[in-house]
A protein has these predicted regions:
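Aromatic- and charge-enriched surface segment that lines or borders ligand/interaction sites
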Residues: 52-57, 79-88, 116-160, 175, ...
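Aromatic-rich, solvent-exposed beta-strand/loop patch
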Residues: 111-115, 137, 142, 183-202, ...
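Detector for C-terminal structural segments
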Residues: 27-28, 66-68, 232-237, 241, ...
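Surface-exposed binding/hinge segments that line
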Residues: 129, 163-208, 223-232, 375-389
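Extracellular/periplasmic solute-recognition and catalytic clefts
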Residues: 171-173, 229-240, 265-329, 336-340, ...
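Gly/Pro-rich hinge or "lid" segments in bacterial periplasmic/extracellular proteins
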Residues: 89-105, 152, 196-256, 260-261, ...
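Ligand-site clamp/hinge motif
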Residues: 131, 214, 247-297, 339, ...
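N-terminal lobe/hinge region of extracytoplasmic solute-binding protein
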Residues: 24-122, 152, 219-221
Length: 615
């Protein structure tokens, strides 16, 4: 599940003894939470998530920067750019979802709008009982009809993502005012109950007479912990904590959503955003630039202990960032060409000279986890790959991972030249050309000019072996249009991986998504073997089996050289003004900023110091 897909981690399946019949709802126990494998970690009647401060004070404000402007409050469609704070899956500031995850657990979730959950032992259906106290912001109750309406609305009029995400749901219906019933297709994904738990519930009475397919700047009716206080289109959105929020005292919310006002300001230039932070106009920021982290926060405020820096590691797979060649282009069809262009990437030089040695090289799809393929395949992983032997590169079975590459760039470039020669290319007048004399060339498309600092050394290495590589920078809106139309040779892509990969892998890697507009299969991969491995992974029925399936997929993708993996930070880098406080230790599988609060005494000192530094 993409992590960032939202703050919702993976949920699902209550472990129950196997059965050969579909139980009726009356025969299935009603539970407070679900776990993908085994029992959920927190018992019925738990009082709060274990990582929060249940007595955290309320009050204060938090200002954050966002790098893109917005023109809509509807994040559920592909048109428009939605404002920060309204997620399309899971609980957000504006909308509650049926369930919410505990980032201290890897595969569990607990009821939010749902006060009770029933799951058929054979996973043919599930039901949610809604909390009778649940209310939208206008006072209307949240009903089963709202859930049915939301599901159908997202599938029929929402982004194409939803149709694939909920493809294994065959029907949904209300069983009374507060119970909703979902029927599942046969051989559905084990994580499907979790996926449904992520469903945000929209008010049918508000949306039924509005055009859901179009962007809007109306302030919608929600049910979540905050209301939109103010909108300045493209520039700022302000949320105000709702003191009458119906779920404020539920165990899943206790100690969370502590800050009264949440302000998201748009800064299209990150250097301006950094200066705004240093001036005290932004309270917290995630730092993405190594040089900023090393030197950008130095100054009187840091010396006086008013600014803090955190590196927060999680147990999730490392985020995957990579150069993504577009396989829809002819020059990238040969895997030997793809391997050759990967050999020209010199991570070690970049890390030393550009990144203050802060990063680690990313090796594969699930780097740093039990799902990362290493050595040679064996056991269940080998059994999964063996039927596909004729469709996979022989190295999958014969060569261990990680792939060995010389540390010396010159030797890597010699290997790249040899691979290109095998693929039918030759060097002619310092140009790499094919048998027809056509130059091997491609353009790397960027939306942020600052990325050239990292990309240009790679381009220079490619040119050393005769490849005509170029960089083009376009504005973010043009970039999005070209991405949606697959109009690029190569981009830098990101693939957020969770500790429980599932349905989202279809959109990353499978043939069915290769030509869909807006799909995340940006590489344009069409490979029946990969398709089969993804479908098999989605239906893995145990943690051990999921790990084996993920390793098989990882191995097959890596030996096809579909991507040129770049690097990752060992943890999230967070800079903050010390008016903010947070509970320790952090949860293992996510950083929950909504468990932070404003310390009023610290805030007074920080604000006085910020006033002193104003001109």
């Amino acid at each position: 599940m993409i992590g960032t897909l939202c703050r919702f981690a993976l949920l699902t399946l209550l472990a129950v003894a196997p059965a050969t019949w579909a139980a009726s709802p009356e025969q299935v126990p009603t539970v407070h939470g679900l776990s993908l494998y085994g029992e959920p970690g927190l018992p019925a009647g738990f009082t709060s998530f274990p990582y929060v401060n249940p007595n955290a004070p309320k009050g204060g404000s938090l200002t954050r920067a966002v790098p893109v402007s917005f023109n809509s409050t509807n994040p559920f469609i592909i048109t428009g750019s939605a404002a920060a704070g309204i997620d399309y899956l899971g609980q957000s500031y504006l909308y509650d979802s049926l369930m919410v995850s505990d980032p201290a657990e890897i595969f569990s979730a607990y009821g939010l709008l749902a006060s009770g959950i029933r799951l058929d032992p054979q996973r043919r259906w599930m039901e949610f009982d809604l909390d009778p106290r649940a209310r939208f912001h206008d006072g209307e109750p949240v009903t089963a009809e709202d859930v049915v309406f939301t599901f159908n609305l997202l599938v029929e009029k929402g982004a194409p993502f939803f149709r694939g995400y909920y493809a294994d749901v065959t029907s949904v219906r209300a069983e009374g005012p507060l119970t909703v019933h979902f029927d599942f297709a046969e051989n559905n994904s084990p994580e499907l109950p979790l996926i449904l738990g992520q469903l945000p519930v929209l008010p049918a009475h508000y949306w039924k007479d509005r055009d859901f397919s179009r962007p809007t700047l109306e302030i919608p009716v929600g049910s979540g912990p905050y209301r939109i206080e103010r909108l300045d289109p493209g520039r700022q959105i302000v949320y105000r904590r709702d003191p009458d929020y119906w779920a404020r005292d539920l165990p899943v919310n206790r100690g969370r959503f502590n800050i009264d006002r949440l302000i998201f300001d748009t800064y299209l230039d990150d250097s301006v955003a950094l200066e705004a932070f240093r001036a005290g106009n932004i309270d917290l920021r995630a730092e993405m630039t190594a040089s900023n982290w090393a030197t950008g926060y130095q100054g009187p405020a840091m010396e006086r202990g008013l600014i803090g820096q955190l590196v927060v590691a999680t147990h999730n797979p490392a985020p995957l960032q990579a150069f993504v060649p577009n396989l829809r282009r002819a020059q990238f069809q040969d895997p030997r060409v793809r391997r050759a262009i990967g050999l020209a990437y010199d991570f070690e030089w970049q890390n030393r000279n550009l990144f203050y040695s802060q990063y680690r090289r990313t090796r594969g799809m699930f780097d740093g986890s039990e799902m990362e393929a290493t050595g040679l395949p064996e056991g269940e992983e080998l059994a999964l790959l063996e039927p596909l032997r004729d469709q996979l590169p022989p190295e999958v079975f014969e060569e261990p991972l990680p792939i060995e590459e010389p540390s010396d760039l010159r030797e890597r470039l010699r290997q790249a030249l040899a691979l290109l020669e095998e693929a039918g290319y030759r060097v002619e007048n310092d140009r790499m050309v094919d048998a027809q004399g056509r130059s091997l060339s491609f353009e790397i498309l960027l939306w942020d000019g600052r990325m050239q600092r990292m990309v240009l050394p790679y381009v220079r290495n490619l040119r050393r072996i005769g490849i005509d590589a170029r960089v083009r920078v376009v504005d973010p809106s043009q970039y999005q249009v070209r991405i949606s139309q697959h109009d690029y040779d190569m981009i830098i892509g990101s693939f957020a991986q969770s500790s429980s990969p599932g349905n989202e892998q279809r959109e990353f890697w499978t043939s069915d998504y290769a030509d869909r507009p807006q799909s995340r299969n940006t590489a344009g991969i069409r490979n029946p073997a990969i398709d089969q491995l993804v479908e098999s992974l989605i239906r893995a029925d145990s943690r051990e089996s999921l790990d084996a399936h993920a390793r098989a997929l990882d191995r097959a993708l890596r030996w096809n050289f579909y991507l040129v993996p770049q690097y990752h930070n060992p943890g999230a880098r967070i800079a903050y003004w010390r008016k903010l406080a947070f509970p320790l230790p952090f949860p293992d599988y996510g950083l929950d900023l909504d468990a932070w609060w404003v310390d009023s005494q610290r805030a007074s000192r920080v604000e006085a110091a910020q006033d002193d530094q104003q001109p």
